[in-house]
A protein has these predicted regions:
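Non-catalytic structural scaffold of enzyme domains
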Residues: 1-230
């Protein structure tokens, strides 16, 4: 079994499911008392979020690259970045850390392609929904068209993520709002929906979505398990 290095804490609410899902995957594959060989570097999300708001993406990339190098020195054999949004800075990690990097958009793209879909809705932070680092990769590498909510919906989705979900607050009102947005995107022809923020799956259970759900945290964790046992 390879040792996986997790870059977490963005937010820590969604890092917990990564640890659980990876261990469950290892136990399911190997049985008995087997558990995952995991190293975790959890960053201070306050600093990361401030850099995001100021547009200081190079600084966030430096922080994560240094964390990845620390995991490499500690014995990690691959890197998993437990957040969608911070994949915007993946170039900094890949250019300075020689370990295999398991990109969350690649894992998600493979899952969508495997389900036979080419047109899906994308929910996430405003950075993930509006910028090209995530949508562009999914489109270019997997020929998947991502539909995003309207501007006012994107603003509210983003607000809920940072002001509620990242603080561990999960309300029925926000759950219903997300379900409403998903239903509207389904009417526009979306075949499925990407939960492109690792906290969204903590808020919206699959049964509340009219579309098949691609929960990026679960998909990414499954990809990590496959890598660890390869």
């Amino acid at each position: 079994m390879k040792t996986i290095g997790l870059l977490g804490g963005m937010s820590w609410e969604s890092t917990i499911p990564y640890y659980r899902l990876i261990n469950e995957g290892i136990k399911q594959r190997l049985g008995g008392l087997h558990s995952a060989q995991v190293l975790l570097h959890s960053v201070d999300f306050h600093e990361i979020e401030e850099c995001q708001r100021r547009g200081e993406w190079d600084k966030t990339g430096d922080i994560l690259a240094e964390a990845a190098l620390g995991l490499q020195r500690a014995g990690a054999e691959g890197i998993v970045l437990c957040t969608n949004t911070m994949h915007k800075g993946v170039h900094a990690i890949e250019s300075r850390c020689s370990l295999p990097f398991l990109h969350i958009a690649d894992a998600t793209g493979r899952a969508i392609t495997g389900a036979g879909m080419t047109r899906v809705a994308l929910l996430g932070t405003r950075y993930t929904m509006e910028q090209d680092f995530y949508r562009g990769r999914v489109t270019e590498q997997f020929s998947i068209n991502c539909l995003i909510p309207e501007a006012d919906e994107r603003a509210k989705i983003n607000q809920i993520i940072f002001e509620e979900l990242c603080l561990g607050q999960f309300t029925e009102a926000s759950r219903a709002y997300y379900a409403q947005v998903i239903a509207r995107l389904a009417e526009q022809g979306a075949q499925g929906v990407i939960f492109g923020c690792t906290e969204i799956g903590l808020l919206v259970p699959e049964e509340r979505s009219v579309l098949p759900v691609f929960d990026t945290a679960a998909i990414h964790a499954e990809d990590a398990v496959a890598f660890m046992l390869s």
